Regions:
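Structural motif
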Residues: 1, 50, 97-99, 171
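Central regulatory/effector-binding core of bacterial HTH transcription factors
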Residues: 1-53
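Short alpha-helical
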Residues: 2-5, 31-32, 121, 140, ...
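Conserved beta-strand core positions
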Residues: 21-23, 67, 165
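Structured beta->alpha junctions
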Residues: 29, 156-157, 171
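C-terminal regulatory
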Residues: 52, 56-131, 136-161, 180, ...
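A bilobed periplasmic-binding-protein/Venus flytrap-type ligand-binding module shared by bacterial periplasmic
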Residues: 70-74, 164-175
Length: 194
């Protein structure tokens, strides 16, 4: 969920600040970020939403990301302009699924026919091809909306919303200087609206 521009900004600055420190980057979604930190696969995770408090995990707020409903310009919901309440239920909704838990709660699902996808890249691809509609992080689809490849849907029952993003780490293995610097970088990005 963290916008790519923020990841790239932080990692370029990290490389300049800590040129001898190795880094391993995994891109995961939803609960898989938490799972990697809990299971000690990753020392530090950045993502969200993390609604529940997990014992032994520290959370540091690093901003928000806006989610907007979008579809391809030829999709019936895009062609309709402003829709009536319930219009989204009659169309395939593409939903990001939490691969870390088959019992994770759904978020923002109103469609009666859903296609569940494991990553935002495949969801983005299918949205652009008109296969369904769904929520996406606004920074990820901004250029597509500006260039007319996707349409920000005006749906009566759905409005855009933001999710909170956090840096997380285990309290028994707090980040060292490089990890602490990276958390501070992500937090400072959110202060300037990056």
């Amino acid at each position: 969920m963290l916008p790519a521009s923020r990841v790239v900004d932080a990692l370029k600055a990290f490389r300049a600040e800590f040129p001898t420190v190795s880094l391993r980057l995994n891109i995961e979604a939803l609960g898989a970020v938490m799972q990697m930190v809990v299971n000690r696969v990753a020392t530090l995770g950045v993502g969200g939403p993390f609604d529940e408090v997990v014992p032994g995990i520290e959370r540091v707020g690093v901003g928000t990301v806006e989610l907007i409903p979008v579809a391809a310009p030829n999709h019936p919901l895009a062609l309709a302009g402003q829709t009536t309440p319930g219009a989204g239920r009659g169309h395939v909704q593409l939903v990001l699924t939490d691969r870390s838990s088959p019992h994770a709660p759904d978020r923002g699902v109103i469609g009666t026919q859903t296609w569940r996808l494991g990553d935002l890249g495949s969801k983005h691809m299918l949205l652009r091809e008109g296969i369904g509609w769904g929520y996406m992080p606004e920074p990820m689809v901004r250029e597509d909306v500006e260039k007319g490849r996707l349409v920000h849907l005006d749906m009566a029952e759905i409005k855009s919303g933001s999710i909170r993003l956090f840096a997380i780490y285990r309290t028994d293995t707090p980040p060292g200087p490089a990890g602490s610097w990276l958390i501070a970088r992500f937090a400072s990005q959110s202060e300037v609206g990056s």
